[in-house]
Structure formats: C-alpha cells, structure tokens
Regions:
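Compact, glycine/acidic-enriched structural inserts
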Residues: 1-6
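Basic, nucleic-acid-binding surfaces and adjacent catalytic neighborhoods in DNA/RNA-processing proteins
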Residues: 11-138
Length: 138
C-alpha cells in the first residue's frame, strides 16, 4: 500500500533496481505499490522532480527516498481534498472530489512553471504530464 509505513526505499530499490521499465509505469503497477493511479503518478513525479521517462534501474536510493516522500505527501493531500473529479467521479456520499484544483502538472499541457512548460506524452497508452527541465532527477 502506498501509504503503508512498510513501504521503504530499500524495498522499492530491491524490486526495481534491474527494471528496464520507466518509473511512471512502475508507479502504476498495483502489485508493486497499490493505490497510485495515473493522475497521482504524474503529480508525484513532478513533486519529487523525477522524470517519468527514467528507468527503474537508473533510480538511486536517494531518489527513491524522495519519491516515497512525494507519494505520501500527494496521496495524503488528495485524501484531504476528497480525491479528484475529472469527469464523473464522486465519493461514496455523492460529493465531488476537489484535489484537481491542486494539480501542478496533470492536464496542464503548455502551462509555464519555473521557466519550463508542462509537456504531455503518452506512455503505455496513458497520458503523462511533466516538465522536462524541472524533472531532471536532481
């Protein structure tokens, strides 16, 4: 589970250190980390300054630690705001989520952020939004 205290950088590093798969796709793998969807994956990677194109094998333990911190930060914030209502999502009580008003990159193609522009690419059939200059794994 993405918010579990059992999720550690060492465990993730061990599972992805030889992976030729981009980190965005790794985040969407529910068998590895349950609870991260497409929208949150883009937001998490932006928050951690990691390119969605980075292969699992190229992530150092220090970047995985940043990634886990961002996973917890973004998902807790999303829960606080009731999730994201992009189309017709409603919570169990029928209310709309409001986290979409906090998106930094998702669905913001062309928006200027810190001297960069949000770019949209498609990975494994899913839209990915990121800032190439800002998400440089540093």
């Amino acid at each position: 589970d993405a918010l579990s205290p059992d999720l550690t950088a060492q465990k993730i590093f061990k599972k992805i250190s030889k992976s030729e798969v981009p980190i965005k796709q790794i985040l969407l793998n529910q068998k590895l980390i349950a609870g991260i969807g497409n929208i949150y994956a883009s937001e998490i990677l932006f928050d951690s300054k990691i390119s969605p194109l980075t292969l699992g094998k190229d992530l150092e333990i220090s970047l995985i630690m940043k990634l886990i911190k961002s996973i917890r930060k973004i998902l807790k914030k999303a829960i606080k705001y009731g999730g994201s209502s992009i189309r017709d999502y409603r919570s169990t009580d029928g209310t709309l989520g409001n986290f979409q008003s906090n998106f930094k990159v998702y669905n913001k193609e062309g928006k200027k952020i810190g001297g960069d522009k949000v770019k949209k690419i498609v990975q494994y059939g899913r839209s990915t939004f990121y800032c190439p200059k800002l998400q440089n794994n540093k």
